Regions:
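Short, surface-exposed ligand-recognition loops at beta-strand->loop->(often short) alpha-helix junctions
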Residues: 11-16
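C-terminal structural segments of small proteins and small subunits
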Residues: 50-79
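Amphipathic, hydrophobic secondary-structure cores in small proteins
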Residues: 33-55
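Conserved short beta-strand edge segments in small beta-sheet-based binding/regulatory domains
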Residues: 32-37, 75-79
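Short, Lys/Arg-enriched N-terminal segments with co-localized hydrophobic residues
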Residues: 1-4
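N-terminal intrinsically disordered, cationic/polar leader segments
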Residues: 8, 23-28, 61
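Well-ordered beta-strand positions in beta-sheet-rich domains
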Residues: 7-9, 40
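Hydrophobic side chains in well-ordered alpha-helices
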Residues: 20-24, 69-72
Length: 79
């Protein structure tokens, strides 16, 4: 079975949104990475995400599929 990889661009404004995003990511049993300026951060790491420049768009790569997490991605997606 081929693992599906999808990506999405999100914007997280502040600590509360980061916490909500990480909580949703942590419920997934597959890897989720955030790419930003050639840096790769684990989407399940709240400190890792908070160390990034949250004024920038962040590219999220999901190595699996979760309808619940997709809703979170849609909520924070950059149009």
């Amino acid at each position: 079975e081929v693992n599906r990889m999808s990506h999405c661009v999100v914007r997280l404004n502040g600590t509360e949104e980061v916490e909500e995003f990480v909580k949703a990511a942590s419920k997934c049993d597959f890897d989720i990475d955030i790419f930003y300026n050639r840096v790769i951060i684990d989407a399940k790491s709240i400190l890792g995400i908070l160390s990034m420049d949250l004024n920038r768009d962040l590219t999220v790569h999901c190595y699996g599929d979760s309808p619940a997490f997709n809703k979170t991605l849609q909520k924070f997606a950059v149009a």
